[in-house]
């Protein structure tokens, strides 16, 4: 189905009122992690309407769909998080290897705002 229309959805439900309630409920399910019943290429609202137009979401099965288990996190998100964790670990490892005592003497030479700068160089 290239384009979903209200007319397509109304072939599957008895009224616009029912369609709105069914679509809202399905969108909330999708946002809560419910598995999609059709190809995922659109936002939740369009996806819900596509599912209704395809006859996969009905007044009779909407409650059963709420009980379906949520999908695991999308692989792309999980991979990005793994890369971020790895980068953070590398940064932390490098930070713990860094010899902070090398610059300790320089850190002690903090110039107080009220004090005059020394003539040492």
Curated annotation (Swiss-Prot):
Q: Which Gene3D superfamilies match?
A: 3.90.940.10
Q: Which reaction does it catalyse?
A: RNA(n) + a ribonucleoside 5'-triphosphate = RNA(n+1) + diphosphate
Keyword Transferase in the entry? The reply is: yes
Keywords carried by this UniProt record: DNA-directed RNA polymerase, Nucleotidyltransferase, Transcription, Transferase
Keyword Transferase annotated: yes
Domain of life of the source:
Bacteria
**Which enzyme class?**
transferase
- What one GO molecular function would you report for this record? DNA binding
Which is an annotated Pfam family here? RNA_pol_Rpb6
One GO-annotated biological process of the protein: DNA-templated transcription
What GO CC annotations are associated with the protein? DNA-directed RNA polymerase complex
* EC number(s) recorded for this UniProt protein: 2.7.7.6
What this protein is reported to do is described as: Promotes RNA polymerase assembly. Latches the N- and C-terminal regions of the beta' subunit thereby facilitating its interaction with the beta and alpha subunits.
Q: What HAMAP family does the record point to? A: RNApol_bact_RpoZ
Oligomeric form and interacting partners: The RNAP catalytic core consists of 2 alpha, 1 beta, 1 beta' and 1 omega subunit. When a sigma factor is associated with the core the holoenzyme is formed, which can initiate transcription.
Protein family according to the UniProt entry:
Belongs to the RNA polymerase subunit omega family.
| Protein known as | DNA-directed RNA polymerase subunit omega
Q: Whose protein is this, by species?
A: Syntrophobacter fumaroxidans (strain DSM 10017 / MPOB)
């Amino acid at each position: 189905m290239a384009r979903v229309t209200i007319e397509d959805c109304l072939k599957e439900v008895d009224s616009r009122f029912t369609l709105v309630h069914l679509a809202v409920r399905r969108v909330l399910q999708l946002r809560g992690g419910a598995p999609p019943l059709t190809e995922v290429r659109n936002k939740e609202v369009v996806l819900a309407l596509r599912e209704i137009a395809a006859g996969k979401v009905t007044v009779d099965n909407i409650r059963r769909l709420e009980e379906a288990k949520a999908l695991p996190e999308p692989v792309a998100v999980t991979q990005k998080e793994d890369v971020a964790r790895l980068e953070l670990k590398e940064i932390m490892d490098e930070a713990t290897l860094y010899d902070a005592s090398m610059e300790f003497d320089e850190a002690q030479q903090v110039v107080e705002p009220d004090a005059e700068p020394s003539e040492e160089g």
